[in-house]
Amino acid sequence: HFPGNSIFPGVLQIEALAQVGGVFVLSKVEDPENWGTLLLKIDNTKFKYKVSPGDQLILKMELLSAVRRGICLMYGTAYVGSKLVSESELTAQIVRNQPPNE
């Protein structure tokens, strides 16, 4: 990211949490293959420590509110080892996939 001071960008950490959140929320529906997720909001994001290229991120996600009307609130954390490096609240919506046009 910066010459001589490589870091793993925070925006990619949040993208990773959003991807995990999408898979996580779809695990809560009966037919996940028929649904997709949209990220609606990122809130209360904190980057606590530098993440360097080659560090292994461990991502954890918890549901803060049940899925209601297709919308849910999640809390995601990223760790390197046992050190919390970033955290964020994510609001997502599940949407039914459109059938392909034939």
What are these regions (language model features)?
Residues 51-102:
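HotDog/MaoC-like acyl-thioester-processing domains
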Residues 2, 6, 11-12, 16, ...:
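Solvent-exposed, flexible loop/coil residues
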Residues 1-37, 100-102:
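Hot-dog-fold acyl-thioester-processing enzymes
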Residues 21-60, 85, 92:
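Hydrophobic beta-strand-centered segment that forms part of the acyl-chain substrate-binding groove
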Residues 13, 28-35, 39, 45, ...:
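Short, flexible coil/linker segments at or flanking structured domains
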